[in-house]
Amino acid sequence: MISKTEITRDWLPRYTGTQIEEFGKYILLTNFSNYVSKFAERFGCKIKGKGCPLQTSTNDSGLSIINFGMGSANAATIMDLLTACNPKGVLFLGKCGGLKQSAEIGRYILPIAAIRGEGTSNDYLPPEVPALPSFKLHKFVSDTLLE
């Protein structure tokens, strides 16, 4: 029987057009294609997977960005597939609801928790348990934003 590892090592390159060894050790996930374009432009790197369901770009410092599309099912799929390259950290860049009137366009928002109402994650934790970020990753991003 084929293992989950074999499946992820086959599917990650197929869905992204990017070989496993081309992914960086740190991953940014987004559901906006223009974020991938801006990343590639900023770091002078190529966009891969333009004809695939998921597009990626990796800079020389070992940071990759992946446009995984929309929805919790796609988010769960890309997280499963990323086990093939075993990243040290994954951070989602996206939308944030429930913001105060004082928030301005262009400000960075670093959420401390998320309400899990999509249903998919109920397989992992009860619905009343919020989704919490990795403390180390959250602290790193917070410190970086404060610099």
Language model features with spans:
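Metabolite-binding pocket within alpha/beta catalytic cores that recognizes anionic/polar moieties
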Residues: 1-140, 144
